[in-house]
UniProtKB/Swiss-Prot annotation:
Chain's gene name: fabZ
Known EC number: 4.2.1.59
Function according to Swiss-Prot or TrEMBL: Involved in unsaturated fatty acids biosynthesis. Catalyzes the dehydration of short chain beta-hydroxyacyl-ACPs and long chain saturated and unsaturated beta-hydroxyacyl-ACPs.
Reaction equation(s) it catalyzes: a (3R)-hydroxyacyl-[ACP] = a (2E)-enoyl-[ACP] + H2O
GO molecular function, one term: (3R)-hydroxyacyl-[acyl-carrier-protein] dehydratase activity
High-level lineage: Bacteria, Pseudomonadati, Pseudomonadota, Gammaproteobacteria, Oceanospirillales
Native species: Hahella chejuensis (strain KCTC 2396)
A Gene Ontology biological process term: fatty acid biosynthetic process
Domain of life: Bacteria
Protein name in the entry: 3-hydroxyacyl-[acyl-carrier-protein] dehydratase FabZ
Length: 144
């Protein structure tokens, strides 16, 4: 899935659209996407000027965004239909290595449960095949 199609599933835009490409998607099961980390991104101005590191909260947000795409594709809905997914919670978040400019962040999400519009995903972010972050992410589907 290319960026123009991603924009059909996510309401986010620059500088907060954190998914560059979807590599694989199995509706109702799994998604894998990528975020290319570049020094030109605004967060690196202050995090940190002489030692740029991708903020952990943005890694979590990127994982939540791919999870949201999976939810939308699974249900056959899009933001244009008047729906969105809100980040509702995180559990078991672990950061294992810093993510720096030049890295390609692979984002993976697997559906654990879906009960009445509350979705639970098992998520991972990887760089060069190594897990840099893992989390359980909850999203809430809402009609706008």
């Amino acid at each position: 899935m290319e960026i123009n199609e991603i924009k059909e599933y996510l309401p986010h835009r620059y500088p907060f659209l954190l998914v560059d490409r979807v590599l694989e998607i199995k509706p109702g099961e799994f998604i894998a996407g990528v975020k290319n980390i570049t020094y030109n991104e605004p967060q690196f101005t202050g995090h940190f000027p002489d030692h740029p590191i991708m903020p952990g909260v943005l890694i979590i947000e990127a994982m939540a965004q791919v999870a949201g795409i999976l939810g939308f594709v699974t249900t056959g809905k899009k933001p244009a239909d008047g729906y969105t997914y809100y980040l509702a919670g995180t559990d078991k978040v672990r950061f294992k290595k810093p993510v720096v400019p030049g890295d390609q962040l692979r984002l993976e999400a697997e559906i654990v449960t879906d009960k009445r519009g509350i979705w639970k995903f098992a998520c991972r972010a990887l760089v060069d095949g190594n897990v840099v972050c893992s989390a359980e992410i909850l999203t809430a589907e809402r009609r706008l």
